[in-house]
Structure formats: structure tokens, C-alpha cells
């Protein structure tokens, strides 16, 4: 069963996919979006859902450190509601506190990637971490 993980931001959506058995997550790509123009990347997402035969989604919830909802939680839930309606597939939510920080640390320490290059992959890696945390917790 393939699960797609999403890190939803205001300008990009990081995308990750699980292996068929649901053990590991792999970052796929970053989809550019524009909330002001109501462009949410659903066409590309549909292509990926078909290509990988996705059966469910996991979306990161950007909570505050004190477990209250951060300013982007509502946007993430709204995105999830759209996906559930468009694809008719279940959507789960995963606390994503510190995943972007962890992703950036990994890119600096392990890959020694420059700031400019980090910006190009950070959301994809964050989506991978969100999905991997979900897989570890549920399977």
C-alpha cells in the first residue's frame, strides 16, 4: 500500500512516497503552488497519485511547540479536505514540529549542502520525514 506524504507550505508542497510495504519514505519532488492565485498543484499531484498508485495521504500539521495549532494548520487541513474530495482517498495528519529544522540540519551536517541548494530540496526532505514518522508510528 503506497502512502503519499505532503509538506504543505504557502509557495510549495513537498512530496514523498512510501515503498509498497509501507516501511520507508522517499522524497519525490517539490510542487510549486500559489495560494493567492488558487493554484494548488492538484494536476501534478493527480499524475503522481496515478503513477504510484497511492491509496492514502499523510499531511504534516505545523503545530507550535506547546501543542497549539500554528498559523498554517488551517491551510494544511483545508488542503487535505480538497485532496480527500478530489481523490476519494483517506487523509491522515502527522505532527510535523521541527521536521523542517531536522531536514535543514541533515542537509548541513550530512550532505554539506549550500543554503541555495537547501532551499530547493528542504520541503521534499521535510515531506519524507513527515511520512517516515507516520510510518514508524503506525506500521
Swiss-Prot record:
GO molecular function per UniProt: nuclease activity
Top-level division of the source organism's lineage: Bacteria
Stored Pfam families: RuvX
UniProt keywords, alphabetically: Cytoplasm, Hydrolase, Nuclease, Ribosome biogenesis
GO cellular component: cytosol
EC numbers on record: 3.1.-.-
Compartments it resides in: Cytoplasm
GO terms, biological process: rRNA 5'-end processing
Chief location bin: cytoplasm
InterPro entries registered for this protein in UniProt: RNaseH-like_sf, YqgF, YqgF/RNaseH-like_dom, YqgF/RNaseH-like_dom_sf
Keyword Nuclease: yes
HAMAP family in UniProt: Nuclease_YqgF
Sequence similarity: Belongs to the YqgF nuclease family.
NCBIfam families: RNAse_H_YqgF (TIGR00250)
Role this protein plays: Could be a nuclease involved in processing of the 5'-end of pre-16S rRNA.
Protein name: Putative pre-16S rRNA nuclease
Amino acid at each position: 500500500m503506497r502512502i503519499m506524504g505532503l509538506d504543505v507550505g504557502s509557495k510549495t508542497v513537498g512530496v514523498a512516497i512510501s515503498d509498497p510495504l509501507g516501511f520507508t519514505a522517499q522524497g519525490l519532488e517539490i510542487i510549486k503552488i500559489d495560494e493567492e492565485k488558487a493554484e494548488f498543484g492538484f494536476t501534478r499531484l493527480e499524475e503522481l497519485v496515478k503513477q504510484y498508485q497511492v491509496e492514502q495521504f499523510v499531511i504534516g500539521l505545523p503545530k507550535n511547540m506547546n501543542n497549539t495549532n500554528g498559523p498554517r494548520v488551517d491551510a494544511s487541513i483545508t488542503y487535505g479536505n480538497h485532496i480527500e474530495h478530489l481523490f476519494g482517498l483517506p487523509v491522515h495528519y502527522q505532527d510535523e514540529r521541527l521536521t523542517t529544522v531536522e531536514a535543514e540540519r541533515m542537509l548541513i551536517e550530512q550532505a554539506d549542502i549550500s543554503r541555495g541548494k537547501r532551499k530547493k530540496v528542504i520541503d521534499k526532505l521535510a515531506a519524507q520525514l513527515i511520512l517516515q514518522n507516520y510510518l514508524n508510528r503506525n506500521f
